[in-house]
Amino acid sequence: MAAAAAGLGGGGAGPGPEAGDFLARYRLVSNKLKKRFLRKPNVAEAGEQFGQLGRELRAQECLPYAAWCQLAVARCQQALFHGPGEALALTEAARLFLRQERDARQRLVCPAAYGEPLQAAASALGAAVRLHLELGQPAAAAALCLELAAALRDLGQPAAAAGHFQRAAQLQLPQLPLAALQALGEAASCQLLARDYTGALAVFTRMQRLAREHGSHPVQSLPPPPPPAPQPGPGATPALPAALLPPNSGSAAPSPAALGAFSDVLVRCEVSRVLLLLLLQPPPAKLLPEHAQTLEKYSWEAFDSHGQESSGQLPEELFLLLQSLVMATHEKDTEAIKSLQVEMWPLLTAEQNHLLHLVLQETISPSGQGV
């Protein structure tokens, strides 16, 4: 323990007490946890003293030492069988390790201690996530997964961040499907940053399927109108005229189900999937059925006189431009792709515009050289 703490201290930020002072106080508190004859160790008191020492070290910007104190607090809470306190201490230790990593990278312009604080933070947060799941708190576990994923992405590790975004989405899906789709979108963006285009295509395909499952609602037809009432007799209250009846009391045709925010997810997934398929250009033998169906929608044979029935949620202009792009890419028409890039630029996101640029580069330099 002492050697590990001293090793992490080398990557610490800011002034503070010497390693010997910290280790002396740390050992003094640790001695209270040793089992003695006819004397039970006071774990609760030791946990409080570890916490106090950690707060003092954090105030002095001795981040690694403060983090080690929080880990000691977590061990004390574990001995007391207090799961929430253990999870809280682990989370605080992880955040201190992340601060140490960020500060060292900002000051030294290089990874701190070869990423050891980042690995320690990931380990502590992973343990906290498992504790929250054991306590039946999936929302808290998902929040920690999102926090770790965002930190990894900001620290230049998008591939590792994508996995934690996907785990957060898995935890959020039963109760918060829209938040789960947002987390999957972040995972796909991280995979694009890591140039894992095949993985990003798989995530966008899953997003589209989940958005259809959770966002579409069956249209329920209105009940038939009641039979005409008999003519009122003398002294009876006259029936309301048709103009004063509620607007939904008639037999109007049902309106299509509105997808709301899910429609934006469907549009993003559809456009990104088409661009990724044009970029990857998988051979027919390796083309999955759902991907083949997507490309078939944009062939000229699929276009009918009724407009763009197969376009789904896409605006008509964007659908026609994507259809032209698919045909131009298949024909290797570089000039047509350049012209379409200008027209599609304001209709796409920055991420999608980058994919379109890669499609153009792949057309100019095929066989993966453009990517």
From Swiss-Prot:
Keywords: Acetylation, Cytoplasm, Endosome, Nucleus. Produced abundantly in a wide variety of cell types. Its main location: cytoplasm. One of its GO terms (cellular component) is nucleus. Residues 236-250 have a biased composition (Low complexity). It comes from the Eukaryota. InterPro entries: F8A, TPR-like_helical_dom_sf. A motif (Nuclear localization signal) lies at residues 34-36. One of its GO terms (biological process) is negative regulation of proteasomal protein catabolic process. It is found in: Cytoplasm; Nucleus; Early endosome; Nucleus, Nuclear body. The modification N-acetylalanine is found at residue 2. Gene3D superfamilies: Tetratricopeptide repeat domain. The keyword Cytoplasm applies. Residues 221-235 have a biased composition (Pro residues). Residues 213-250 are annotated as: Disordered. RAB5A effector molecule that is involved in vesicular trafficking of early endosomes. Mediates the recruitment of HTT by RAB5A onto early endosomes. The HTT-F8A1/F8A2/F8A3-RAB5A complex stimulates early endosomal interaction with actin filaments and inhibits interaction with microtubules, leading to the reduction of endosome motility. It is linked to Up-regulated in brain tissue from patients affected by Huntington's disease (at protein level). In a Huntington's disease mouse model overexpression of F8A1/F8A2/F8A3 impairs proteasome activity leading to the accumulation of mutant HTT and causes defective mitochondrial functions. Interacts with HTT (via C-terminus). Interacts with RAB5A. Found in a complex with F8A1/F8A2/F8A3, HTT and RAB5A; mediates the recruitment of HTT by RAB5A onto early endosomes. This is 40-kDa huntingtin-associated protein. It comes from Homo sapiens (Human).
